[in-house]
Amino acid sequence: MSQFSSSRAKIPEHYASRGIRHWSNTKIRCPLAYLIAEYSYRQPRYYAAKKASENGDAEADLQVAHYAKPKSINMLAGTAVHEAAFEIANGKTSQSEAVRHALSTLQEHRPAKYNKRDITITDHLLSDDGKRVATTIEQTVEGIREAFAGANQIDVEEKIELELPGIDVPIIGYTDGRGAGVIGEVKTRWDRISANSKTGFANNSVPARAELNDIAQIALYQKAFGGGTCKIIYANRISHIVHEVSQEQLDEAMNQTLVQLRKRQRILERTETMRDIIDLCEVDWSDF
């Protein structure tokens, strides 16, 4: 039996004491300082306060608010477009209904008052009666249909749990889509703030080649499934592009991931406190 297959499997102390029960693509790629600040500090305190609040502790409400981390409009928009596009591609809903639902979700977003950037982007994204969102959904659907040509059904949000040699906890993730022998990952691009534009925004173009972090992410899924053709779909409000990733690129990405995980695990093993880890970091505050 797998060392990770039982819910009772013991998490090593050097992981458990830092609030890390598994790796994810985000945890692997993010800067070390962010990993500790987010997963070892903020999240455990937020969920502890939330549980206390649900159990009737009124004072915990302040802690919930303090440690909460509101999602950005770009994050919410990406999720909404993913869901809408796969629903359309699988024939489960119409384009108009999917767009309507995505917009209704995004219109509920209330940016944090301190997050001026998110306020500006939210106003821009929703200022044209949803046309930017609608056209991004259209481009994403076209990209999905191109990537999964011949698939009768695309399975979405499949959970993967991957074990790697020498790594004490598994990698857990969720695919965007899989069908007809293809593993597909969707990446949406949203207008970016630009001081050189009359509108204050510029189109965020789709990349001419697949980006390294995206290759590393989809390589995890291929490894977990034991094979498959990997394609990354990039879409914005104007265009889309589908990049098929070579096996050489995937293998190299997996090798680099294993190197990164071994480094991070050694840091966890050889430090006693979070302060010890933080002392190893050169913090770039733009990561936060």
Where are these regions (language model features)?
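Short loop/turn segments at secondary-structure transitions that flank enzyme active sites
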Residues: 83, 87, 91, 190-192, ...
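Active-site-proximal flexible loops/turns
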Residues: 37, 89, 192-195, 224
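Non-catalytic protein-protein interaction segments used by genome-maintenance enzymes to assemble
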Residues: 75, 160-217
